[in-house]
């Protein structure tokens, strides 16, 4: 059987780092208040000339180089983002051009913070269906451009950045010891769409709008939804939490991460946390955390890695991958 194996990984962050203390002159807040409630200490903010496309292209180049490939080897460019450069054409097409790729196809996918999980799952389907051999999967965001900088409950939470992986078709044996994606589960429930949304859009207000969130409501649903979809992935493979080498969750809030790991009985030392350095980078969150753990030597070939995310909609999902 065909498996989708991770061949390369890369990331990119804006130059500017904004610390919690930098917010004290903007809104009524403090470093202590932010850290206590979120675990965030700093985040990167896109500056002039830094966009979703430029960050995504930089992460993509790094992933292709890490894979030992050339841009011309890529069949599909799949970008998960909620902050595209333009309403259309797709920012994935712009990244395709930046990389000099003139073959295959490219498109954007939008599932907010769950975007990268949705994108990996979509890429896996294209690979296993024979429509692509190598897929460049990117999560890139510039959420700082849709924040209300007078709302202290949201503006302190988010950062900008990008992460990317190259998935490649490889022959597997249908075993959980195979390298590659072993299971993926996606969910959504539009009944919760008013709990985390942007109050604008081309079809309604003809503006971009700003991010709005009912933080307590999101927190209330997050842990249960996340653990349910993870347990479904375990059931599909016969694996358990004890088999997990690394848990790479969406980096939204350390409280949610800790509560999810505890409910799943995943040891603290197996949890990859970058929310303290990156904040919530939406669709870029999981690949940025993955890239960090690969770069520092934690995640190694053969490790069983659990990925999960939850975002506006609500959307949520989980992926089990053998590195």
Swiss-Prot record:
Q: Which GO terms describe its molecular function?
A: 3-oxoacyl-[acyl-carrier-protein] synthase activity; beta-ketoacyl-acyl-carrier-protein synthase III activity
- The Enzyme Commission number assigned here is 2.3.1.180
Q: Name one Pfam family in it.
A: ACP_syn_III
Principal localization? cytoplasm
Catalysed transformations (reactions):
malonyl-[ACP] + acetyl-CoA + H(+) = 3-oxobutanoyl-[ACP] + CO2 + CoA
Which keywords accompany this UniProt record?
Acyltransferase, Cytoplasm, Fatty acid biosynthesis, Fatty acid metabolism, Lipid biosynthesis, Lipid metabolism, Multifunctional enzyme, Transferase
Q: Which InterPro entries does the record cross-reference, listed alphabetically?
A: ACP_syn_III_C (IPR013747), ACP_syn_III_N (IPR013751), FabH (IPR004655), Thiolase-like (IPR016039)
Per its UniProt entry, what is the enzyme's top EC class, as one word? Answer: transferase
- Region ACP-binding: start and end of each range? 251-255
- Active site at 113, 250, 280
Q: Where in the cell is it found?
A: Cytoplasm
Q: Quaternary state and partners of this protein? A: Homodimer.
Spell out the family assignment given in the record's similarity comment: Belongs to the thiolase-like superfamily. FabH family.
HAMAP family documented for this protein: FabH
Domains: entry comment: The last Arg residue of the ACP-binding site is essential for the weak association between ACP/AcpP and FabH.
| Its biological purpose | Catalyzes the condensation reaction of fatty acid synthesis by the addition to an acyl acceptor of two carbons from malonyl-ACP. Catalyzes the first condensation reaction which initiates fatty acid synthesis and may therefore play a role in governing the total rate of fatty acid production. Possesses both acetoacetyl-ACP synthase and acetyl transacylase activities. Its substrate specificity determines the biosynthesis of branched-chain and/or straight-chain of fatty acids.
Name used for this protein in its record: Beta-ketoacyl-[acyl-carrier-protein] synthase III
